[in-house]
Amino acid sequence: MSVARTSKRGKAVVLAGALAIAVAGLGVWLWAGNEGEAKPLSAPANPCWDGMPSQGSMQKLLGPGNKFFISKSPYRVIKDHWPSHCAYDAESDDRVELVLSMHLSWAGEPPKADDFQAAGALRGDKAKTFDAGVHAYYLKATNRLYFQCDVDQPKDAPEYIRNDKYVMVDVLAHPMDSAHLTAKQAREVGLDMVLEVAHKVADQAGCTNDTNLPKTAPQVADANWPRYH
């Protein structure tokens, strides 16, 4: 695994969990409302925000020729530190399936890598440690990443913004059957998306520290859930 930047000041932590709303102390995406109207899109779908995720990554989850419906909350995570949410539903035969769900928000501190509740891991599961201090729990289809982002805030910035030190990117990748992906391949696509988005947000936020974000995702040895549920 290669690393984009290295610094003792920067931290990047990857955590994966089963359900976003089950993570202790991180109910911020419960506020993410004001979602726009869902409308059909032709694959590859338009990105949720400015270039993220890439259409190429999205297409890997889809397989050929699927239609999409997108819902998203306003993209205010950079300026206002407001949680943002985006979801893609794909129309398959006679049903609509969730293909991708993404959340962006800020936090004062990330959960500890060995905290199974905060990480969404199961009791007894151990984090895998990679270069650059990246920790990952390979559980289900959610990939969650926290990275430190120091920003020169104006003196009149609200206290909650001044206290936010970490950006959280959460991606739930759920491939369609027509994509013909194995669980391991689905995990790899999800991790690639997390890093795509994290690098983009870091650039937009103007982090003054070295974020220590890897350029490429850690190698996936296995994935332990049936049919991505």
Residue ranges of model-derived segments:
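Hydrophobic membrane-insertion alpha-helices, especially the h-region
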Residues: 2-32
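A small/polar (G/S/T-enriched), proline-flanked helix-loop surface module common
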Residues: 36-199, 203, 210-229
